Amino acid sequence: MKDWEQFLQGVVTRKDVLVFLFRDTLRSKQDAVAKALCLAAFSSGHAGFVLQTLLEEEVTRFEQDCNVILRGTSLLTKWMDVLLQLPSSRTFLVERLRRHIHVLASRYRADELELDPVRLPQRAAPPGVVVDAAGEMEEDGRLAENRDRMASILHEVVKAVLPAAESPEWQDDKHFLNAPLRWTCKEIFQCCETHHLHTSALLGGFYLLRYVNPALAMPEKHNMLDPDVSISPSDRRSFILLSKMLQNLANDVVFGSKEAFMAPLQEHPLIQECQRHVSQSLLRLGAVEPDVLALMEPQIEEELVLSLLGDAPQEEGDRQESVARD
């Protein structure tokens, strides 16, 4: 333990060394070590410096392309993943999303949420009956109803994870969103101001794409479903569609620019409301008062300590005591 303490003391006295160790550790995918270095950064007061350094390197390397900056394999996103995997981050997401996930999993059949006419199951015509224009109109009506359902679900999800900018939830910054997430959003906001980046695009890439969207695409891996609830392959399609819709909002792109069947959603009133809502509310994520920000870093440090203790292997005596209690 003394050797480990001496190592950390040596690390925290040099910000440049800390960044170097982060860079090397994140590439090697050593999660526990990355978490320990993250703790060293927060305990020494250098966490902001480390994240800003990684952000600036990505901005320079990829010429301010926000979508590339937050690519899945970047060092920046691996740093962020350390904070996204903390218990408070996972708990917050479950509290906000679980009810909406269950609605999607249990209330509707897959064909009631399908948006692609090619994938929409055709209703069989009676023997000897030829489907005419009226039949095609019926299919169009089903698609319109499906778009209404999916737009409504997306609208509820967006409001759950991102309150309106004027919402009372924002009045107490210590209670909406946990400290690791809000702290990261503030640092991203600061980097965007420094480098004149598209703030909502980068914040949306972090918060909506890296944090919220994986739970929509794979809810069973994020503790969103009760043990007795399962998702069939056909139902999985509905979750994928919802995650694609949220991705469009996060990237601020026109619906239908990638997949033509999404184009009618661009004119849907609820989708347009979601676009305005996301654009305004994402900026609120990064607006953290200095006194509130000062309270966050000790909270993050404490949670990293507890998380590391949970990752640590038990000593033989501890294991025997645990077995005896059981």
Q: Language-model segments: what does each one mean?
A:
Residues M1-D326:
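Extended alpha-helical scaffold/tether regions of large eukaryotic proteins
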